[in-house]
Amino acid sequence: MLCLALVAAAPAAPKEAPKEAPRGAARQEPRAAISAVLDDWHKAAGAADEARYFGHFTADAVFMGTDATERWTRDEFRVWAKPFFARGKAWNFRAVSRNVSLSRDGAVAWFDEALDTPNMGPCRGSGVLVKEGGAWKIAHYNLSVPIPNELLPDFKGRIEAHLKQPAPAKGEPSRK
């Protein structure tokens, strides 16, 4: 009983306040995970790993290509891309810089990235990822070719001339 009384009377050890992760570090972890997803997605294309590449998309994802006609659902994009994956190498994009932002609840992210591409030259990608079942998935991706402002008047004229050409008949190759 004396032992119990001594324990009860002893001053309690001061409790340490729970340690909080620094705000920057807490926000950095999802950004690193998102960058890893995007890097793996680009590597999957270079390795022609179709299942891995398309596995990074949500079921209702949209891919916007560089041509004005290129707006595809994930499944439409997969059909379009199938011949590229079948030949053993799709495309090779490498991010040289990337910015990632997160929603307050951490369930949605958006990004932009500068890309180095051997076939198209410098490109830019931007998009939205959502967290599904604990994994980040691409819900929307927009690929573009940045045009220096000084070159825009020439490109504008070339695009206008291109659009004045008659559209190909059904079944003919596109005017690309």
Map each language-model feature to its residues.
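Low-complexity, intrinsically disordered terminal/linker segments enriched in charged
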Residues: 132, 140-176
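Bacterial N-terminal signal peptides
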Residues: 1-8
